[in-house]
């Protein structure tokens, strides 16, 4: 594992030194210096190398790269094909529906992706990757400065009461159907990267670019690094920037009991990341970095929100069991597995 992390660091340091700070014109959307630095910061954070991660993120947040990034006014613009490669995009994978000639790597095959249909509502898509119901509850725990529900809720998730919760923004139909007509029951679906606002069905050729890293994520990562390094007071600034876009009160006002307590701040930051970044492929890495799977206390916090974690056993459920046929065919596999486990224990 140290060798792998070492190679990741080497590659991304080299990339950040060679890549341009920005691309323009037809080249816009290609990976940049800032993207390499943000990816490297992620790698450092997973290793708890907070000072190194902070150094990389500083370039984007307060350093020379700050001029290239910001938060878009409308949260939804991060998940629309009409507002791609915007100021909030740090690393964005480009997709297109121009070619729909199949799903392989052959010439003329699709340039789109399949997330929209795989995560789609039953009857519209495959209903894989359902969102967790506790997310809806978490969004509803706090109101905006105007007393309304968090606007990120209706952009992020589709659920039974979304039309009732947002009567001014919703028509009550999704892909041309009411919730009752769709027979979607109590399921909670990810709305991010869906196309319900301009289609009545989904296919395997979605043109929506996938935002691997948004500037909001960078700000929250920077806040986490500051907090871990003992600078909780300054960390508030960057969380509040993300909350302000959602019309939420500053963290100090909403949760004064946190103060400068490092653990209380981290606990709230964990929730802030879930509210801002759910469905964007960061949750598993977050939970692993916070080591919530490693202790009964961390696991209890997960179970309190999501009872499905009751099946998880600390020290046992971290990996899937080795297939019996692989063990039978390779007499060395158990030896290698035991050695790796011993290395991790040390």
Q: Language-model features: where?
A:
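An aromatic- and glycine-enriched ligand-binding surface/loop that stacks and positions planar moieties
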Residues: 5, 13-16, 30-177, 297-302, ...
């Amino acid at each position: 594992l140290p060798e792998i992390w070492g190679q990741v660091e080497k590659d991304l340091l080299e990339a950040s030194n060679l890549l341009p700070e920005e691309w323009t014109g037809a080249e816009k959307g290609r990976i940049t210096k800032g993207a390499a630095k943000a990816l490297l910061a992620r790698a450092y954070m997973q290793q708890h190398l907070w000072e190194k991660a902070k150094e990389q993120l500083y370039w984007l947040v307060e350093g020379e790269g700050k001029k290239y990034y910001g938060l878009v006014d409308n949260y939804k613009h991060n998940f629309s094909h009409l507002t791609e490669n915007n100021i909030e995009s740090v690393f964005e994978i480009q997709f297109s529906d121009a070619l729909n000639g199949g799903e392989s790597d052959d010439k003329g095959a699709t340039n789109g992706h399949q997330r929209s249909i795989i995560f789609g509502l039953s009857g519209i898509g495959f209903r894989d990757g359902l969102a967790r119901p506790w997310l809806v509850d978490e969004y509803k725990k706090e109101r905006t400065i105007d007393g309304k529900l968090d606007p990120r809720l209706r952009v992020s998730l589709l659920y039974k009461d979304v039309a009732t919760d947002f009567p001014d923004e919703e028509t009550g139909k999704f892909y041309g159907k009411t919730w009752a007509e769709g027979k979607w029951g109590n399921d909670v679906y990810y709305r991010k990267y869906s196309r319900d606002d301009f289609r009545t069905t989904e296919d395997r050729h979605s043109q929506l670019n996938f935002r691997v890293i948004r500037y909001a994520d960078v700000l929250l990562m920077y806040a986490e690094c500051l907090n871990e390094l003992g600078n909780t007071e300054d960390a508030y600034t960057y969380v509040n920037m993300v909350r302000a876009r959602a019309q939420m009160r500053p963290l100090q006002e909403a949760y004064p009991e946190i103060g400068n307590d490092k653990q209380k701040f981290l606990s709230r930051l964990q929730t802030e990341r879930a509210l801002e970044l759910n469905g964007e492929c960061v949750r598993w890495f977050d939970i692993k970095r916070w080591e919530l799977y490693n202790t009964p206390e961390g696991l209890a916090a997960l179970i309190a929100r999501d009872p499905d974690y009751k099946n998880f056993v600390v020290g046992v459920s971290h990996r899937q069991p080795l297939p019996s046929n692989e063990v039978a065919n390779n007499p060395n596999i158990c030896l290698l597995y035991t050695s790796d486990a011993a290395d991790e224990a040390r």
